[in-house]
């Protein structure tokens, strides 16, 4: 409701910055978890991260995890560093609490099957089909099954 009018939207933005202030990190994104785990994926160079600033995303820390999120309407998790089985419940509990304080009712994470983050989320939450990815191979030496994505690699993030 607050996001529907200009006056209240400004108040909500100030409130959300207050809620997120202690969690925010001065970064434009996080390293690609898929490439870190040995897959091929989007190179998150400084130029790429600068390009991604067109969208209101932020990097936050909850417990030991660093999470790249977009909280425009829902919370979209773009990618995560240091999300492990040992800290996952604590991280998700903290993220759910943050969503509650922001009045957000949905948290989404999208990634390619077969990655460690996919396996971690699939252990705790039901999976559902998401965005299809199609490839046209123009002679790349990288097999398509080795290419993986997370939500932050998509332009809508």
Sequence positions of predicted segments:
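Generic structural motif recognizing short loop/turn segments at the entrances and edges of beta-strands
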Residues: 44-45, 56-58, 63-65, 72-76, ...
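Acyl-donor binding region in acyl/amide transferases
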Residues: 72-130
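C-terminal functional modules
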Residues: 108, 116-157
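Compositionally biased, low-structure terminal segments
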Residues: 3, 9, 89, 139, ...
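Amide-forming acyltransferase catalytic core, primarily the GNAT-like/NAT-type
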Residues: 1-74
């Amino acid at each position: 409701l607050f996001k529907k009018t200009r006056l209240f939207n400004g108040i909500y933005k100030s409130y959300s910055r207050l809620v997120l202030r202690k969690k925010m990190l001065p970064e434009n994104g996080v390293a690609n978890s898929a490439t870190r785990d040995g897959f091929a994926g989007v190179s998150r160079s400084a130029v790429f991260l600068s390009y991604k600033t067109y969208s209101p995303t932020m990097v936050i820390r909850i417990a030991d995890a660093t999470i790249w999120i977009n909280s425009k309407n829902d919370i979209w998790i773009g990618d995560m560093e240091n999300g492990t089985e040992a800290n996952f419940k604590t991280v998700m509990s903290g993220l759910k609490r943050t969503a509650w304080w922001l009045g957000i009712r949905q948290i989404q994470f999208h990634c390619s099957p077969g990655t460690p983050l996919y396996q971690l989320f699939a252990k705790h939450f039901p999976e559902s089909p998401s965005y299809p990815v199609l490839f046209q191979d123009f002679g790349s030496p990288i097999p398509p099954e080795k290419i993986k994505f997370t939500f932050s690699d998509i332009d809508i993030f």
